[in-house]
């Protein structure tokens, strides 16, 4: 009998002449794609949600705990039936979440060794993988009758705030074979990221780390002269202070306790077939200062990123970032219009009841993007 549990809702949870209007079509069945083109009002192309995660996301079928335990035996002691009779873990236990992540990375991404120091963020992998797949769609080029996502080390990605968990480079390298540069303001995060890749020699050459020595900058001090990136990634700190971050953690823990109490009162489902259910909220509420908050919070971070991106307009094909607070989208888009971004896209990733927003922008015209892709393919 196969015991699979789907990731829960919280886990998967301008002064220039106007350019010609361009039609934008979203082919993603799992997101709402909004595109802004100069000279055109905001339009939304809505698509039906058929699955909670991106079609290429290997976690669409949920957690196969027997397979995970077979791949990573250390997970076994943390797995037990939940009130509904399905195998699960206690997602409030940081060690259990870390063991689950290590098992997922080993089973699905061939990452043999992964670990993070105590107190650092332990990210939910299914949702992080979604970000990788959605930004991959930005790079897709038409080959014959289908669009193809470019693979291999010729695709170069910059991960701003890579963290000790260095999750985006691991997922991007093992999913598409891309090359990554990961930056962070925390020396301990950089050291652990280096250790993770040193422990996985098969992919170590695909990753380089860079310490950002000035926390007030995003791209300055990281992107080198004449260096080019196809994509930049970022999961910004979204709190403006330690007190705000602590309040958010307390609120989540309170909700977790309420959900667990409710689940314990539920009657087990009577069925001889495996039942796929939503588990307790899969969150680990650790995190260091740079991972959780920064001066000015998420909005200030986004404004700095957008302002600096204009200075590297010709060195990056697509800039992208996650936006956790919906109210920050409007001022971010206003600033993008001010710096004359050529095209802006907003992708809403629907993961259960949680909506995660990806904001993407480019300063290159369509013909320049096409030449970029052609040059990249020839260059390598």
From Swiss-Prot:
**Primary enzyme class:** transferase
GO terms for biological process, alphabetical: rRNA base methylation
EC annotation? 2.1.1.181
This protein's major location comes to: cytoplasm
Q: Which Gene3D superfamilies match?
A: Vaccinia Virus protein VP39
One Gene Ontology cellular component annotation held by this UniProt entry: cytoplasm
- Which InterPro entries is this protein grouped with? METTL16/RlmF (IPR010286), rRNA_lsu_MeTfrase_F (IPR016909), SAM-dependent_MTases_sf (IPR029063)
| Segments for region (Disordered) | 1-32
Q: Which GO terms describe its molecular function?
A: 23S rRNA (adenine(1618)-N(6))-methyltransferase activity
UniProt key word Transferase:
yes
Q: Name one Pfam family in it.
A: Methyltransf_10
Which cysteines pair up through disulfides? They are none
* Keyword field: Cytoplasm, Methyltransferase, rRNA processing, S-adenosyl-L-methionine, Transferase
Task: Please write the reaction equations for the catalytic activity of this protein.
Answer: adenosine(1618) in 23S rRNA + S-adenosyl-L-methionine = N(6)-methyladenosine(1618) in 23S rRNA + S-adenosyl-L-homocysteine + H(+)
This protein's source sits in the domain of life called: Bacteria
Subcellular location per the Swiss-Prot or TrEMBL entry? Cytoplasm
State its role: Specifically methylates the adenine in position 1618 of 23S rRNA.
What family classification does the UniProt entry report for this protein? Belongs to the methyltransferase superfamily. METTL16/RlmF family.
Q: What protein name does the entry list?
A: Ribosomal RNA large subunit methyltransferase F
Q: Which gene encodes it?
A: rlmF
